[in-house]
Amino acid sequence: DDAAKIIKQILSAVSYCHQRNIVHRDLKPENILMNKDIKDPKITIIDFGTSSSFRKDERMSQKFGTPYYIAPEVLQNNYDEKCDIWSIGVIMYILLCGYPPFNGATEEEIIARVTEGTYCIDDEDWEDISDSAKDLIQ
């Protein structure tokens, strides 16, 4: 339930940015602050250093982002604002099980796994996760 509330706020904030033609390009837990001092925590997205304005009909090609959270399209230098949605999916995966879906000992290994798009939700860390949350991840 907490993960759903957090993801809903992140999606709302990113939608706000996208409606104003701003793409973040480096969404990750380290760039999301949460106010825990109140009953209903609020998030704030920070570090817009790699953000950019965009046009709906144009693709971007500059490679920005953090390997664990980067969309495969960014690695191919051909992406749009939806790269932020990929990153939110990775953040959701981490909120649910505690670790990233694409792992590796080196940056190159992580990027290879992101490119392959292979991840697992069948191990014991996912036993207590609802089927609807698993469906959303897939």
Descriptions of predicted regions:
Residues 61-73:
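Conserved activation segment of eukaryotic-like protein kinases, specifically the C-terminal portion
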Residues 84:
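Conserved catalytic-loop aspartate of Hanks-type protein kinases
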